[in-house]
UniProtKB/Swiss-Prot annotation:
Residues annotated as domain Acylphosphatase-like: 3-90
Family classification: Belongs to the acylphosphatase family.
Native organism: Shewanella oneidensis (strain ATCC 700550 / JCM 31522 / CIP 106686 / LMG 19005 / NCIMB 14063 / MR-1)
Keyword Hydrolase: yes
InterPro entries membership: Acylphosphatase, Acylphosphatase-like_dom, Acylphosphatase-like_dom_sf
Protein's name according to its UniProt entry: Acylphosphatase
Amino acid sequence: MKRVLIKLTGKVQGVGCRRTTLAKARVLGVTGYVTNCVDGSVEVLAQGSHVAVDNLIAWCQAGVPCTVGLRVDVEEYQGDDIYLDFSIVR
């Protein structure tokens, strides 16, 4: 299983970024969460098969719909949390 934290910066809040990321993650079979951060960014914790997680990363890097000036940073997630689905954390 592959686990990563994806940080999306730019104009990413208030544009449907979490909702579209939720939909894409579910289609790909990725579990975890997406949440708004106080610094104006969006954080995605993604876990699943290497192929599924890599596809979500590639989708983010190609430009999440409705975002402006998007920057995508990815790092391995060292936690041992197990998520059974993908959700929006408010």
